[in-house]
Amino acid sequence: MNVLLADVTSVGWIAAGAVAAVLAGHWQVLAVAAGLAAAVWIYDFAAKSTPAGPLVMGGCRGLNWLLGMTAAGGPQAAEWLLPAGMGIYVAGVTFYARQEAGRSRRLPLGLATAVMAAGLAVGGWFVVLLAADGGSDWLSRAGLDNWLLLWAVLASSVLFRCIMGIATPESGNVQRAVGNAIMSIITLDAVLVLSACGERWAIAVLLLLVPFVLSRRLASPT
């Protein structure tokens, strides 16, 4: 019942946003919102326990990014790397999370970690291309090297936990790696936003950590 309520609530918010977008004349947003709502329902009621589950969940994350970007008039050219990269990352996290019950196998954990690393590389490549194209105001001030260092630190913190889970594939280690990878989604999003939109919008994204941390008191993120 709680899962059903959460699904109805999330789809309801998506629908409300889609209606607002239609009223404003943004039909592309409606199409993306419909795709996102469908992906959420497909994952929870059909794909969650199947081999396609990680792909569908990754698609949900990619469409989530795409929804916001479409509402802002994008994506254009290299901006497609953002939903692609974070979608790949979340697909890897979902695949890794499937191994958390009992003693896990190293091969699936290793493959999942490689998928996560690939997603992080794709997302980071967007910023490299952005800088090559003239960059944003923030990149002009801070420099690409500083952003890449920040991204590398965050990516390493995620992947290190995952590697620890591979080295000792016990339930507790895998669960900690998954929890860290999920919580890092918000931080990674914020750093990507920082590169293109600056500190103000990055801070707005980081504030999403507050409800996330509070919700962990009620239920495990995994």
Give the ranges of each region predicted by the language model.
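Intramembrane alpha-helical segments
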Residues: 2-100
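C-terminal membrane-associated helical module and adjoining short loops/tails
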Residues: 24, 59-222
